[in-house]
Amino acid sequence: MTATRTEALTDAGQKTVFKILAAISVCHLLNDMLTSLLPSIYPLLKSSFHLDFAEVGLITLTYQSTASLLQPLVGLQADRRPRPYSLAVGMGFTLFGLLMLSMARTFATILVAAAFVGTGSSVFHPESSRVARMASGGQHGLAQSLFQVGGNAGLSLGPLLAAFIVLPRGLSSIAWFSVAALLAMIILANVGSWAKRHRLNRTKSHATNAEQHATLPVKKVALSIAVLMALLFSKFFYLASLTSYYTFYLMSKFHVSVRSAQIHLFVFLGAVALGTIVGGPVGDRIGRKYVIWYSILGVLPFTLLLPYANLFWTGILSVVIGVILASAFPAIVVYGQELIPGRVGMISGLFFGFAFGTAGVGAALLGELADLTDINFVYLVCSFLPAVGLLAAFLPNLERAGLHTAQESPV
């Protein structure tokens, strides 16, 4: 297969636009902070609506399914006809879903609200990931890390806000967070204006800078994508056990309060944010394959220890697991973008969507497993998932193959 190598040529004369990266990261923080309110209030929803674990998992499945199924389609369409202003529209879906959730009186309403929130994420992630790459100035791993760390920071804030605002004041207090959604829409409208101007400038330079560059054979690319998807499955299925059921695990095994469990979840998600910061720049420096290999397989000893640890060591191990495991995702996304030049939106949508979908299916299946057995058994089973990291041995070394400069046509 061949691809147009242009970005490597034009990036050499461009600087990293940290102002845009910061704006996208802040909006990612706000988006994921708002969406993470949903799993953070599961204890409240479970008690208020008399739900079992399977129904809790169904809420997550509804949210993650709408996000995962739509994201690759949104990303592919964005590659063909970029619509930077769709970022603000996507945030509008999230806003509507939150307002619906704050007024929910039935389980069906909760599911519909979760679907709207998921749709907002499906629009936000592919296009914003494209914009982050546009502003990278060639430092793609760094840009992806800065973009993703905003999301991880938002995910860590969600449980904290739920613990200190929503849980004491009730479900209706979620409506207060509409202010954050409106702020994000304003910022994203300005980011969309910049992206439109940037794309026009790059299109003008494309005609003089384009040249052809051979990449990996189609079969090799397909195998590599399949391996990356398997690694994402391992990573996000395991993360689903923590993001959806970690609070229940702590309350069941160690008899801590809901607020204490939420704080533990906040610490874990903070560790995930730290790992995300590290993964991209390290991948730029030493190669993304090595980051992927270590971050998935290297976490295995710690996940195996977690089910047998006391409360103190559970907190420590969760931090170590969060840092190591999270470092993989920026490297995986950029690695995939380099495998298939010209399809930044599609790859971003595919990987983000698959991640959300895996988390949703994982949450539902683990909820069923917890109902059939107990929550402790769930973590015992999940502790072996990082062994899938052995598949990273089948990934080609793009840097050694000279493929790391193969990039997409102007975005």
Set out the residue ranges of the language-model regions.
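Residue-level signature of mid-helix packing/kink "hotspots" within the transmembrane helices
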Residues: 36, 64-72, 155-156, 269-277, ...
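Extracytoplasmic gate region of multi-pass secondary transporters
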Residues: 38-39, 222-269, 273
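Helix-breaking motifs and short loop linkers at transmembrane-helix boundaries and internal kinks
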Residues: 50, 82, 103-108, 137, ...
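Helix-to-loop junctions at the C-terminal end of transmembrane segments
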Residues: 70-82, 276-287, 370-371
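Cytoplasmic helix-loop-helix junction between adjacent transmembrane helices
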Residues: 113-150
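Helix-loop-helix hairpin linking two adjacent transmembrane segments in secondary transporters
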Residues: 147-197
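C-terminal transmembrane helical hairpin of 12-TM major facilitator-type secondary transporters
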Residues: 283-332
